[in-house]
UniProtKB/Swiss-Prot annotation:
One of its GO terms (molecular function) is orotate phosphoribosyltransferase activity. It catalyses: orotidine 5'-phosphate + diphosphate = orotate + 5-phospho-alpha-D-ribose 1-diphosphate. InterPro entries: OPRT, Or_phspho_trans_dom, PRibTrfase_dom, PRTase-like. Homodimer. GO terms for biological process: 'de novo' UMP biosynthetic process; pyrimidine nucleobase biosynthetic process. Belongs to the purine/pyrimidine phosphoribosyltransferase family. PyrE subfamily. Keywords: Glycosyltransferase, Magnesium, Pyrimidine biosynthesis, Transferase. This is Orotate phosphoribosyltransferase.
Length: 194
């Protein structure tokens, strides 16, 4: 089945099933935030697949602000997301460039924090994230983007683990929009395995 031809509702359901099957694991894990958890979500097997990225880009694009001229995110989780959205936007004849925020500055040359076709200073950029737990990674990306002279109003995430990210992001004056929360992912994984 071609996911491009599906409706938004069926695209969401299909993406949720892909995430539950390929991105979610139950066990004992240490998260990037340092927290221990029985639930692990690694979206890369989905975001690095053609169908997964098409579904995701289709669902994310309507949430990117109209005045946003770029999408950006912290490497590595956001790399396929920003590329997929830039391509989906181009297919709709919308200019939306992809930017990648490094975890530390490039060690040579320009020593850049941000890679990609940089927009004019003051431009609105939407930040993308695969999974949010505390919001730390997202806010690090926002900090570097803001220091570079750009404006961020919202963060789009695939999965919100519901462990404080929304509150921390809101405290920073930003809006968090997530396609799914951890409870939805856990339930779909249970449904698939039963």
């Amino acid at each position: 089945m071609n996911p491009i031809a599906q409706s938004k509702d069926s695209s969401r359901e299909k993406l949720l099933s892909l995430l539950a099957s390929n991105a979610y694991r139950h066990g004992t894990f240490t998260l990037s935030s340092g927290k221990k958890s029985n639930h692990y979500v690694n979206c890369k097997p989905v975001t690095l697949s053609g169908f997964g990225l098409v579904l995701l880009s289709d669902l994310f694009l309507p949430h990117v602000e109209e005045d946003s001229i770029a999408v950006a995110g912290l490497t590595l989780g956001a790399d396929p997301l920003v590329s997929g959205l830039a391509m989906a936007a181009a297919q709709q004849e919308r200019t939306l460039n992809a930017l990648i925020v490094r975890k530390e500055p490039k060690g040579h040359g320009t020593e850049a924090w941000i890679e990609g076709p940089l927009p004019p200073k003051g431009s609105v950029i939407t930040v993308l994230e695969d999974v949010v737990t505390t919001g730390g990674s997202s806010l690090k990306a926002v900090s570097q983007i803001s220091k570079a002279g750009y404006k961020v109003n919202r963060i789009l995430a695939i999965v919100d683990r519901q462990e404080g990210a929304a509150m921390e992001i809101q405290k920073s004056g930003l809006l968090l929009i997530s396609l799914f929360n951890l409870d939805e992912l856990v339930q779909r994984a249970k449904d698939i395995s039963s």
